[in-house]
A protein has these predicted regions:
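Short aromatic-enriched loop/helix-cap "lid" or pocket-rim segments at secondary-structure transitions
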Residues: 12-19, 98-100, 125-126
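An N-terminally biased module of ancient metal coordination in phosphate/nucleic-acid-related enzymes
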Residues: 1-73
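Glycine-rich phosphate-binding "P-loop"
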Residues: 60-61, 115-133
Length: 184
């Protein structure tokens, strides 16, 4: 059995601004209990009890998505007895998208991209992520993922489901995984 969505972090290797912000309550609640390293060894112990034998790491808001991807890839390479692939963050609206995806595709464990469309109405309005589905660059980026045989992991709030369905129907070549359906 494969765990299709989990996170790892090492606060000494990769910077996660949202995770390291002390005293900031998020849409999912108080992050204090998870403001510590969560590494593959601990994850595997938890996952094996449930029958998992492989997993997919989903990006978790690193300030440097490439550093996070390279760190996860090094873990995958160092643990061949635990098949581990990953979904990374890449800004699908970026003018450097082709170059960014070219770089990510040099990292062997990468299978797809997650750019969060919806977390909570309040946070999405502040960050502008609630406008991504209206962006032609974002829609083009979704299509480009499929052209490169990369998947898209969709995290959204309920009010965005219909709009997301319309965007995704315009890129039928892109395989999409629905994560945090309805968020969180």
């Amino acid at each position: 059995m494969i765990d299709a969505h989990h996170h790892l972090w090492d606060l000494s290797k990769v910077h996660y601004p949202w995770l390291e912000a002390k005293g900031v309550v998020r849409f999912f609640g108080d992050p204090t209990p998870i403001q510590r390293n969560y590494l593959l060894k601990e994850f595997r112990e938890n996952a094996k009890v449930e029958g998992f034998r492989a997993s997919v790491h989903i990006q978790v808001g690193a300030s440097d998505p490439v550093a996070e991807a390279m760190w996860i890839d090094s873990i995958a390479e160092a643990n061949p007895d635990w098949p581990l692939v990953q979904v990374v963050h890449c800004d699908l609206t970026s003018s450097t998208l082709d170059k960014d995806l070219d770089l990510f595709q040099t990292i062997p464990s990468i299978r797809g991209v997650r750019q969060i469309v919806g977390r909570s109405s309040e946070e999405d309005t502040k960050s502008g992520t609630n406008d991504l589905l209206s962006s032609s660059a974002f829609c083009d980026g979704i299509a480009e993922l499929g052209n490169r045989n990369l998947s898209f992991d969709l995290q959204l709030t309920p009010e965005l489901i219909e709009q997301a369905a319309n965007v995704l129907s315009a890129a039928p070549q892109t395989k999409t995984a629905l994560c945090h359906a309805g968020s969180p």
